[in-house]
Amino acid sequence: MGKKAIQFGGGNIGRGFVAEFLHEAGYEVVFVDVMDAVVSALQTTPSYNVTEVSKDGENTKTISNYRAINSKTNESDAVKEIATADVVTCAVGPNILKFIAPLIAKGIDARTESKPVAVIACENAIGATDTLHGFIKEHTPKDRLDTLYDRARFANSAIDRIVPNQPPNSGLNVRIEKFYEWAVEQTPFGSFGHPDIPAIHWVDNLEPYIERKLFTVNTGHATTAYYGHLRGKKMIADALADDEIRSMVHKVLDETASLIVSKHGIPEDEQKEYVDTIIGRMSNPYLEDNIERVGRAPLRKLSRKERFIGPASQLAERGQKFDALVDAIEMALRFQNVPGDQESADLAQILKQKSSEDATSELTGLEKDHPLYSPVLERVAKVQQDTK
């Protein structure tokens, strides 16, 4: 029998990042999703194209050898597939992990294979596989928890690839940045060895990769979007062509770089080169990366361990500079009532209805005695005053 991977989420990242590399590694990919239109398209289309875009041009790959299951209507089929899979991946968004966990738990529990399935969450969040693992344990029979490790191994990952808004009428085809990074922990697999997926960079300690990526790529991307939005820019590349915005992004990434260098021992010149590469990637006009797409979901992006409060809080605890990050947090607070983004409307309501103290606590999760709390509280109050 050939190798089989289950991919939860048939969206652009699922099709255009995860499935691309699973396909190239020789896996049959079984997509699991609840969106009728996505599942139907995958079931009726034998192949789709992934077009990698860089400043040097475009390269198109054809992806085939996949199936799709609607877990809303065919849960038992999805359970059977997981029970015989080699790998389970997901790209559904961190907030959806709790909804896919019961199904994955059933599939794992039904396994009779001697080799455990590899479970890898591919989300923009620190420790996403750990989070999924926790939810799966909640849905595993108590008398089976002790042997869960025999049936599944869970490895955190760090993913990095820009997937811009897609052109209209693209169908299943995906335009995506050529650059990518996919780092995954190898230690959980022990003597069984990790899955054979050449695109993955297998590492012993993932935290430096996750924090470097989240606090450089995601922080830089979102900072560009929030400054750009306030100045009426439409595309990320347009925003970075503005010298003032580019300068602000550099200042933010200088601060996160100081954290990454001091905490993880990454050489300063290596981190500087990484930052320059990231800004170069985001400046690529061929990606047509929309500012509202990058800025959406500000509540999640302002939360405690995310791209702004995460690094700023650690810098504050270490007595290091975090001024530019606080400026960026203010810009994120101003991303309100953007059409098509519910979180930006919710943000506006929180700032309108709550006191500065309550809003700061709810939005950031910071403790009132934290050294970052007061500087952020000042910005919350300022934005509330400006938007009355």
From Swiss-Prot:
GO-annotated cellular components: cytosol
Reactions catalysed: D-mannitol 1-phosphate + NAD(+) = beta-D-fructose 6-phosphate + NADH + H(+)
GO MF annotations, alphabetized: mannitol-1-phosphate 5-dehydrogenase activity
EC numbers on record: 1.1.1.17
Catalytic site: 213
UniProt KW Oxidoreductase keyword: yes
Sequence positions that bind NAD(+): 5-16
Signal peptide location: none
A family per Pfam: Mannitol_dh
Catalytic EC class: oxidoreductase
Keywords: NAD, Oxidoreductase
InterPro entries: 6-PGluconate_DH-like_C_sf, 6PGD_dom2, Mannitol_1_phos_5_DH, Mannitol_DH, Mannitol_DH_C, Mannitol_DH_N, NAD(P)-bd_dom_sf
One BP term from GO: mannitol catabolic process
Biological role: Catalyzes the NAD(H)-dependent interconversion of D-fructose 6-phosphate and D-mannitol 1-phosphate in the mannitol metabolic pathway.
Entries under HAMAP family matching the protein: Mannitol_dehydrog
Quaternary structure and interacting proteins, as annotated: Monomer.
Family in the record: Belongs to the mannitol dehydrogenase family.
Name of the protein: Mannitol-1-phosphate 5-dehydrogenase
